[in-house]
Amino acid sequence: MSSSNFSCILSISLTFFILLLNKVNSAETTSFSITKFVPDQKNLIFQGDAKTASTGKLELSKAVKNSIGRALYSAPIHIWDSKTGSVANFQTTFTFTITAPNTYNVADGLAFFIAPIDTKPKSIHHGGYLGVFDSKTYKKSIQTVAVEIDTFYNAQWDPNPGNISSTGRHIGIDVNSIKSISTVPWSLENNKKANVAIGFNGATNVLSVDVEYPLIRHYTLSHVVPLKDVVPEWVRIGFSSSTGAEYSAHDILSWSFDSKLNLGFENNINANVSSSTQAA
């Protein structure tokens, strides 16, 4: 065999191997990091009273009665794939503060949520529904998963405060309902920064939550959440908060998100998608 023929065969073989490798490892990824929110935050959709402040924070609901504020990442997220059955792995971290006139009358909390891409708030979402659920749908499937930081006890659906804490404040995992499927007691540190890490394993369907007031308190919980059976294939992610008769300010100071959806042997030339935002 001549050297030219050998080189040609080797080149074809290498090309085939690379194409096969790309086919096997094709994946969709989304990644962004916001270290400081700016007045014209183009990668966010604002709903209700939510807005960015000149101080670099994202203000959700106002510190007034019956306020709702939500902020969504502008690009839809491919959370599972109908062709391969694959479910994405994701990790999101954020820092928040809740500030109230006093530590007794605090309401109602905030949530990180995953919902259909056309999700919008309604006026009946205020108060204990955290801007995500309402009295008509809280027992029905609305294709929504949320992690709530709940500051106000609502007897209709919240865990009995006698069983978890004197105030009823808790962190919860919500699946299609404001009634959490898993909770852990939580104590508010008024106007102090809390760090949150939420992770999802697409292979095990385990959603894990870690909330920490540095050097003060640390909370964890986890639960199996079959995302493929709960939310649409394409979703939006974001934050929501609300107030009722009592109120407090709910602010997000930073936010990062990373997801990866492995598409297996799907030959998708546009399979690798990424986005990145960094505000100094």
Curated annotation (Swiss-Prot):
Signal peptide (from-to): 1-26
InterPro entries: ConA-like_dom_sf, L-lectin, Lectin_LegA_CS, Lectin_legB_Mn/Ca_BS, Legume_lectin_dom, Leguminous_Lectin
Keyword Iron-sulfur: no
Record's keyword terms, sorted: Calcium, Glycoprotein, Lectin, Manganese, Metal-binding, Signal
Domain of life: Eukaryota
Molecular function GO labels: carbohydrate binding; metal ion binding
Keyword set includes Secreted: no
Binding positions (Mn(2+)): 148, 150, 158, 170
Pfam family, one: Lectin_legB
Glycan-modified residues: 163, 272
Further remark: Lec2 is probably non functional, since a frameshift mutation leads to premature translation termination after only 98 AA. The sequence below ignores this frameshift mutation.
Family listed: Belongs to the leguminous lectin family.
Protein name as catalogued: Truncated lectin 2
Species annotation: Medicago truncatula
Gene behind the chain: LEC2
